[in-house]
Amino acid sequence: MEVVMPRALLVLLSAALALTPTRAGSHSLRYFYTSVSRPGAGDPRFIAVGYVDDTQFVRFDSDAATGRMEPRAPWVEQEGPEYWDRQTRTIKETARTFRVDLDTLRGYYNQSEAGSHTRQTMYGCDLGPDGRLLRGYSQDAYDGADYIALNEDLRSWTAADTAAQITQRKWEAAGVAELQWRNYLETTCVEWLRRYLEMGKETLLRADPPSTRVTHHPVSDHEVTLRCWALGFYPAEITLTWQRDGEDQTQDTEVVDTRPAGDGTFQKWAAVVVPSGQEQRYTCHVQHEGLPEPITRRWEPSPLSTIVIVSIAALVLLVVAGVIGAVIWRKQRSGGKGPGYSHAARDDSAQGSDVSLTAPRV
């Protein structure tokens, strides 16, 4: 299996500048490569994307009409033509390498030429708040399963199976980790990450606080789901926790992965199922870099719901008052003049009419 990286990447990233991040917190530069074979339909499709923190800034698709590495963030567009030419040459070289790798891997696993297979790589570096390297990494996968990974010491490899051990032996013999990956991750990757952070600092170093709310969803006659939402925040790192009377409900909380909102920000929610009528005992706590301090949210019934409840109660009272008034009026009409009183005798024609009663006979 050929060495995929970072030989070509060293050419691409040789013009690195040493710049210092201007915001506390860690940052990352990561690349994701995917090659998918398609027997009978030509060369494998190759897609590459690059991310600074949570922002995609470059992309290449071998099926795209341009056939070039393309910018995906406004701040990287300020790079000149030479940068994009180098990026394109490098990524096309990597695509060719991946095409060969797919054939090699198919042989390692004794697979036929009929099926489609996938080769993936993720690599990059993380910087700490002081601008120094926290960690470097390179991980390879085949058909969705781990294949081989660079260890934290940046000097050795971990193979996932016997096929990957073949690659491991080749790379160890060639000194791939020590001579290429370690140098790239400790030096070149760090320098380019600092450069990108400086170029895109207005976007990358911002901290957009989340907008938060709690929604109410009946589950049954006895239970409801309270869902705590965090929307429109950046960067993606955020913590949502539910508490009941001040005690964490981690084990009973359903939390989804942070998701891109499509506008450069992120969204996330965490939910708990609670007994009906006990909603006010539960609080959602949100922590994010864009917040001066953590915030707490409870479910608050909407004003419309309160108006409806009050209106229904008032209507019930009016109905009850009307019934009581009708009963009193009927009593006054029929027997409300005291005991011993009796109607005077009258003709049948007077029954049911409003004629005055005649004086009783003596």
Curated annotation (Swiss-Prot):
The keyword Calcium does not apply. Glycans are attached at residue 110. Keywords: Disulfide bond, Glycoprotein, Immunity, Membrane, MHC I, Signal, Transmembrane, Transmembrane helix. Its main location: membrane. Residues 25-306 are extracellular. The keyword Ion transport does not apply. Pfam families: C1-set, MHC_I, MHC_I_C. GO terms for molecular function: peptide antigen binding; signaling receptor binding. Residues 330-362 are cytoplasmic. Residues 300-306 are annotated as: Connecting peptide. GO terms for biological process: antigen processing and presentation of endogenous peptide antigen via MHC class I via ER pathway, TAP-independent; antigen processing and presentation of endogenous peptide antigen via MHC class Ib; immune response; positive regulation of T cell mediated cytotoxicity. Residues 25-114 are annotated as: Alpha-1. It is found in: Membrane. It is a single-pass type I membrane protein. Residues 208-299 are annotated as: Alpha-3. Heterodimer of an alpha chain and a beta chain (beta-2-microglobulin). Involved in the presentation of foreign antigens to the immune system. This is DLA class I histocompatibility antigen, A9/A9 alpha chain. It comes from Canis lupus familiaris (Dog).
